[in-house]
UniProtKB/Swiss-Prot annotation:
InterPro entries linked to this entry: GrpE (IPR000740), GrpE_coiled_coil (IPR013805), GrpE_head (IPR009012)
Localization per record: Cytoplasm
Record Gene3D superfamilies: 3.90.20.20, Head domain of nucleotide exchange factor GrpE (2.30.22.10)
Gene Ontology molecular function, alphabetical: adenyl-nucleotide exchange factor activity; protein homodimerization activity; protein-folding chaperone binding; unfolded protein binding
Assigned protein family: Belongs to the GrpE family.
Keyword Cytoplasm: yes
Protein name: Protein GrpE
Length: 194
């Protein structure tokens, strides 16, 4: 064999070795690509699932926010109605008092009016008013003859009364009122001195 033939054979063997190495590397690369493409597909599927989950969560959050806003709006409307119409029953109970006072004025203006009848009508009107107030938990404070209570009474003056216990209410200028037990207006009274 000549050198030239020997070189060709060596080159041919080298080419064969390179080709085998290249083929094995390509095979290895294609094997690596297959699992990589499976991983990519799995990751893309996971991304799609997470995007769908995110969209659902966003929709649920928007729905919850809308429901909360609607509930807040309904509550505000209920409070507004309560403020507007909360006194409706009270007004209904007080209107007969206004009607009776108008009748009493008309009766007092009539010629030859019996003052006793007018007084009786006004007393009945006052009773109607007090009863209407009681239905709404407004109670009168009429402390005549009771011990003075600075929580419920306001002393206008003090007078010496030897026959009355000291610090006793001897006269009521103006009755007081409570609403559900809470003082609205104290009774204005005269108290006996000690």
């Amino acid at each position: 064999m000549t050198n030239h033939e020997q070189d060709q054979q060596d080159n041919s063997e080298l080419l064969d070795d390179d080709q085998v190495t290249l083929e094995s590397q390509q095979a290895a690369d294609s094997g690596a690509e297959a699992p990589a493409s499976d991983d990519v597909a799995a990751l893309q599927a996971e991304i799609a699932r997470l995007n769908e989950e995110l969209q659902t969560t966003k929709e649920n959050a928007l729905r919850a926010a809308a429901e909360a806003q609607n509930a807040r709006r309904r509550a505000e409307q209920d409070v507004e109605k309560a403020h507007k119409f909360g006194l409706e029953k009270f007004v209904g109970d007080i209107l007969p008092v206004a009607d009776n006072l108008e009748r009493a004025i008309d009766a007092a203006k009539a010629e030859g009016a019996d003052l006793g009848v007018v007084v009786e009508g006004v007393e009945l009107t006052l009773k109607t008013l007090v009863d209407g107030l009681k239905r709404h938990k407004v109670e009168q404070i009429d402390p005549q003859g009771e011990p003075f209570d600075p929580q419920l009474h306001q002393a206008m003056t003090m007078i010496e009364q030897p026959d009355v216990e000291p610090n006793t209410v001897i006269n009521v200028f103006q009755r007081g009122y409570t609403l559900h037990g809470r003082l609205v207006r104290p009774a204005m009274v005269v108290v006996s001195k000690a």
